[in-house]
């Protein structure tokens, strides 16, 4: 089997293809590397100006080495093999959007550090209980969540109460699974 691509190799290919220097770029796309990336290694720390980083569609198992990315606002890690959210604390003060659908995440431990997070796309993971989902309530700015395809969502959608139960736990939500959240008071207020 082919050896995994390193971040350093992927960055060199990206620089060659785009004609940009990785250390100066605001947006860096390292998705779908062949062979795939398996580790977020220390070479990521060279991306000192990066605001949007895409590492989706690889074989990454752990979030790591984000400490040099002082301006990171959007992190795309969808379609990997990530099992938990450890490693995000390094970008807790700047990250506004986390795209982490199609991974193996069961627990949301560590999400509380993401104080600026507004958008969380984490469909098709393994979250199965409300205790985990409720941890999202610790994020003051979170307004848009995609959670479809998690066992918790599937169970409650089948029971017909997903939106209602989710919004009860996260009253600040504006959008859930792509649908605008309409609060009870707003509906009643429209009738007057």
Swiss-Prot record:
GO terms for cellular component: cell projection; cytoplasm; dynein complex; microtubule. Gene3D superfamilies: Ribonuclease Inhibitor (3.80.10.10). This is Dynein axonemal light chain 1. Interacts with DNAH5, a outer arm dynein heavy chain. Interacts with tubulin located within the A-tubule of the outer doublets in a ATP-independent manner. One of its GO terms (molecular function) is alpha-tubulin binding. It holds the Pfam family LRR_4. SMART domains: LRR_SD22. GO terms for biological process: outer dynein arm assembly. Belongs to the dynein light chain LC1-type family. It comes from Xenopus laevis (African clawed frog). SUPFAM superfamilies: L domain-like. Part of the multisubunit axonemal ATPase complexes that generate the force for cilia motility and govern beat frequency. Component of the outer arm dynein (ODA). May be involved in a mechanosensory feedback mechanism controlling ODA activity based on external conformational cues by tethering the outer arm dynein heavy chain (DNAH5) to the microtubule within the axoneme. Residues 150-192 form the LRRCT domain. LRR repeats lie at residues 49-70, 71-92, 94-115, 116-137. Outer (ODAs) and inner (IDAs) dynein arms contain the molecular motors that generate the force to move cilia by ATP-dependent reactions. There are two mechanosensory systems that monitor and respond to the mechanical state (curvature) of the axoneme. One system involves the central pair microtubule complex and radial spokes and the second system involves the outer dynein arms. Keywords: Cell projection, Cytoplasm, Cytoskeleton, Dynein, Leucine-rich repeat, Microtubule, Motor protein, Repeat. InterPro entries: Leu-rich_rpt (IPR001611), Leu-rich_rpt_4 (IPR025875), LRR_dom_sf (IPR032675). It comes from the Eukaryota. It is found in: Cytoplasm, Cytoskeleton, Cilium axoneme.
